[in-house]
UniProtKB/Swiss-Prot annotation:
Protein name, per record: Histone H3
InterPro entries listed in its UniProt record: Histone-fold, Histone_H2A/H2B/H3, Histone_H3/CENP-A
Residue list for modification Phosphoserine: 11
Main localisation: nucleus
Length: 136
């Protein structure tokens, strides 16, 4: 079932207010908490949607530079030892990698939506790659 947007509605009626006796008795028997306030929590999905909007607006790289550079050097080590990289080359690789991943996740999300889900799964990534012709 598709999710629909919830809107606040004014209550038109319901239970009558309780008598004060029950609340006074409960307040006397319960120990004083000293006014400890619960930390504010957003509803599930609110922060995720905010992050989606934030990262769609931004253009900065999302993977940290040094861990990515170590990964590039580790992969390059398998092909040839003692390779040196210009910083601009590593940056170009990172830009291309992030652009590829963003596109893959967009297609993956479309696959999940097509399956009437809102959660992406490994099978969505596999389907997206298969449709693209990257993996048989």
């Amino acid at each position: 079932m598709a999710r629909t947007k919830q809107t606040a509605r004014k209550s038109t009626g319901g239970k009558a207010p309780r008598k004060q006796l029950a609340t006074k008795a409960a307040a006397k028997s319960a120990p004083a908490t000293g006014g400890v306030k619960k930390p504010h929590r957003y509803r599930p999905g609110t922060v995720a949607l905010r992050e989606i909007r934030r990262y769609q607006k931004s253009t900065e790289l999302l993977i940290r530079k040094l861990p990515f550079q170590r990964l590039v050097r580790e992969i390059a080590q398998d092909f040839k030892t003692d390779l040196r990289f210009q910083s601009s080359a590593v940056l170009a690789l990172q830009e291309a990698s992030e652009a590829y991943l963003v596109g893959l996740f967009e297609d993956t999300n479309l696959c999940a939506i097509h399956a009437k889900r809102v959660t992406i799964m490994p099978k969505d990534i596999q389907l997206a790659r298969r449709i693209r012709g990257e993996r048989a």
